[in-house]
Every structure is written in C-alpha cells, then in structure tokens.
C-alpha cells in the first residue's frame, strides 16, 4: 500500500517539482546544480518551475532535464511522460537564407561594376586610337598639300628652284672657257698699266727702249708680273681666275638625302631658295641670307650641315612629324 501511494504521489508531481525535491533531499542548491551542469541559475530555476524559455529549443531543454535527473539519481523513464508535456518537440523556425540573396545581389552589383569599368576602358582606348589616326591623317594631308603647292609654284616659276649641282656646273663652265681671250685682255690692259708711269721715268730710258721692243716685253711678261702695278691701280685678272674654285659661303646650307623627301627652304628676305621633292642619294647646296626657315616632310631622310656643322633633327625623327625649324647665324634650330 505504501509503495503504490508513493508511486501515485510521484505521478501527481510535475517534472520540475520532482527534480526540486530530489535536489533538496541531496542537500544541493540551485547554484551547485547549475555549476555541475554548466548552466545558468535562471535555467535551473525555469526547469524546476516547469517553464520552457521561448529562446531555448525544446531539444536542448529535454537534454538539460535528463542531465538534471541523472545528477539527482532519478530514472529517466519516470520523467519521459512529463517531458512530453513540459518540453514538447517544436518545429524549429528556419530563418530565410538571406546570405544567399545578399551574395546574389552583391554578385550582380559587382557584375554591373565590372561591365561599366570595361566600357570606360574601351571608350578610352577608342578615343586614343581615333586621336592618333586623326593626327596621322592630318600630317599626311599637310605633306600632300605642301607637295602640291610646291609643284604648282615650280610650274609657274621655274626660277624658284635651285639645281642640285649649280656650283659644280659653274666651275666646269669656267674651267672649260678658252683662256686666250682672257690672256688678250690681260695683255691689252697691262700695256697702259706699264706705260702709265712713263712721264715720271727718265727720258733717256724711253730713248733706249724702242716701241716694238716694249710691246714684245709686255706680251712676254707672265701673268703674275701684271699684279705689280703702281699705287692706286686695280689688280688685273689672270688666267687662273677662271679655274679657281670660288670661296665657300659661311652661310651655305648643305643637305644630303637618303630617301625621297619633300623640302621647302626660305631665307630671311622671304625668297624661296628651294621648294619641291628631292630624290634618294641627292644633295642640295643653297646660299642665301640667314636665318633660313625649313619645312621638311621626312626629317629622317635628310642630313643637314650649316656652317660646317650638322643640324640635329632627332626630336622630329622621334615624333615622326613634319620638321619646321629656323637656322640662324649661330646654328640654333628652333621649331
């Protein structure tokens, strides 16, 4: 009878009340139970008061109750009916997977950003290419225009073009000229030069030298002797004057061409010394009044010497542009 009464009394008690009675019989406090089970004191108190915290899953609550029962030596089988009532299994609320949606939105945003970046890059490359092509086309058109203008000017006025071998042709013409007229002129002009101081000479000397002998001596006198004239008389030309190379002008402009090149040269007076196309292996020797203004279509195809010194065209060659420069007396080219 006593056993059945005790069993009925235990069934009447709730799970929390049975755990509290067992704890008190063992002389344990709620703090001691919480420390042994590694729980909060509030959690132990809720279990003894048959409360189910809303923020605690039923699975964890059932586990805490079983651990509490083993601690106070209560069989788990006796607590199972009460556990179904105190901590029924509840379906866990699964939160929506926001991380996936956030990642998807971030990926979409990154895709738009990457597309915009590539678009800007393509636009910059396209603008750079268009600018380079327009600049190159403008240079080619400018060279063509200058070449057409020079051709028209050459057709209208051939005197503006300077021959390539002007100095050489002149020297050859002077060298091949017969020397007999020069000698005759020198002889005829020397006779007055020798007889000019005759009034100042002793009359006896005039009587000794007959006129015919004087003519013979004058004709036989070599050309260098004719330079010894009295004071105030101008020196007379000789046979060597026709074959002597003229002195080089210090302002001469010498150009050698390694390829076909369009060229225009203007001196300080505005006269065009040359305007036209020069062929490969050609050379040009120009003389005028400095400073010279030059326009060169292909700077890499020409070598210029001014006052015996080379002119530096490397800055035009590097940029592959039409060279516009001025050569002054100090040979300081300026664009």
Swiss-Prot record:
Q: Transmembrane stretches, by residue range? A: 112-132
Provide the protein's localization: Cell inner membrane
- Where are the stretches annotated Disordered? 148-244
Q: Which GO terms describe its cellular component?
A: plasma membrane
Point to the regions of Low complexity compositional bias.
165-205, 217-239
> Which keywords does this Swiss-Prot/TrEMBL entry list?
Cell inner membrane, Cell membrane, Cell shape, DNA-binding, Membrane, Signal-anchor, Transmembrane, Transmembrane helix
The UniProt entry lists membrane topology as: Single-pass type II membrane protein
Cite the InterPro entries for this sequence: Bact_Cytoskel_RodZ, Cro/C1-type_HTH, Lambda_DNA-bd_dom_sf, RodZ, RodZ-like_C
Where composition is biased (Polar residues), the residues are: 148-164
Per the record, the similarity remark reads:
Belongs to the RodZ family.
UniProt remark on domains: The helix-turn-helix (HTH) motif in the cytoplasmic domain of the N-terminus is involved in the formation of spirals to maintain the rigid rod shape. As this protein is anchored in the cytoplasmic membrane, the HTH motif may contribute to protein-protein interactions to form the RodZ helix, which is localized beneath the cytoplasmic membrane. The C-terminal domain may be critical for determination of the rod shape by probably interacting with enzymes required for synthesis of the peptidoglycan layer, including PBPs in the periplasm.
Q: Which PANTHER family match?
A: CYTOSKELETON PROTEIN RODZ, PTHR34475
The entry's protein name is Cytoskeleton protein RodZ
Give the source species. Answer: Escherichia coli O1:K1 / APEC
Q: Which gene encodes it?
A: rodZ
